[in-house]
UniProtKB/Swiss-Prot annotation:
GO biological process terms held by the UniProt record: cell division; chromosome separation; DNA replication
Family statement drawn from the similarity comment of this UniProt entry: Belongs to the ScpB family.
Pfam families the record matches: SMC_ScpB (PF04079)
HAMAP family from the UniProt entry: ScpB
InterPro entries named among the record's database cross-references: ScpB_csome_segregation, WH-like_DNA-bd_sf, WH_DNA-bd_sf
Functional description taken from the UniProt entry: Participates in chromosomal partition during cell division. May act via the formation of a condensin-like complex containing Smc and ScpA that pull DNA away from mid-cell into both cell halves.
Subunit structure: Homodimer. Homodimerization may be required to stabilize the binding of ScpA to the Smc head domains. Component of a cohesin-like complex composed of ScpA, ScpB and the Smc homodimer, in which ScpA and ScpB bind to the head domain of Smc. The presence of the three proteins is required for the association of the complex with DNA.
SUPFAM superfamilies: Winged helix' DNA-binding domain (SSF46785)
Protein name per Swiss-Prot or TrEMBL: Segregation and condensation protein B
A GO CC term assigned to this protein in UniProt: cytoplasm
Keywords: Cell cycle, Cell division, Chromosome partition, Cytoplasm
Localization: Cytoplasm
Length: 209
């Protein structure tokens, strides 16, 4: 007999498969999150049933022993760390061995620095590859932040750099970023900016004992 995947409000056990699916969807969606309509469409249920699944999952995450939460922000649902654990996340960022950034993270950061505010889709169009992981890394290290929402379908998140970004690279203002040629296309932007940040990161690494 085929296992029932949809949610019945009067049967708590049937909610388990749907909760697991929603959790996986939100994890895969990352910072962009998913709307109620998107979740309902994937589960093949109406929005009221999808909302019940989300509420059940939110209740699970509200327990003290859970380190993440399910938030609703600007009409979309997404997973995020709890604020009470911010001090531990800061320790992770400052821990020895955590200072170096991957090539993918440097590329993504360079694009954001020069093109902010910018959406994930625009970043991926320039890089030519998915950028979920680099964005998560940069967010975790507080080098970038959400600065708003773009107009249009889904109102995607806009990313920009932070004060920590300036501190990390020893800059006082964004004006200290080296100017790019006016004719630079997206490929040239990525190459030039990436070289600059890679060199800065190497210098910072050499200065550390």
């Amino acid at each position: 007999m085929e296992q029932q995947e949809t949610v019945k409000k009067d049967d708590a056990s049937s909610a388990r498969p749907a909760k697991a699916i929603v959790e996986a969807l939100l994890f895969a969606a990352g910072d962009e999150g998913l709307s109620l309509a998107q979740i309902a469409a994937v589960l093949d249920v109406d929005e009221s049933e999808a909302k019940a699944v989300i509420a059940a999952l939110q209740e699970d995450y509200s327990r003290e022993e859970r380190g993440i939460q399910l938030m609703e922000l600007a009409g979309v649902f997404l997973l995020a760390t709890k604020k009470e654990h911010a001090s531990y996340l800061k320790k992770l960022v400052e821990a020895p061995g955590a200072s170096s950034l991957s090539q993918a993270a440097l590329e993504t950061l360079a694009i954001i620095a020069y093109r902010q505010p910018i959406t994930r889709a625009e970043i991926e169009e320039i890089r030519g590859v998915k950028s979920d992981k680099p964005l998560q890394t940069l967010m975790a290290r507080a080098l970038i932040k959400e600065v708003g929402r773009a107009e249009g379908t889904g109102r995607p998140i806009l990313y920009g750099t932070t004060a920590e970004f300036l501190d990390y690279f020893g800059l006082k203002t964004l004006e200290e970023l080296p100017p790019l040629p006016e004719w630079a296309d997206d490929g040239e932007l990525e190459r030039e900016a990436d070289l600059f940040f890679e060199k800065l990161a190497e210098n910072l690494s050499d200065e550390k004992p």
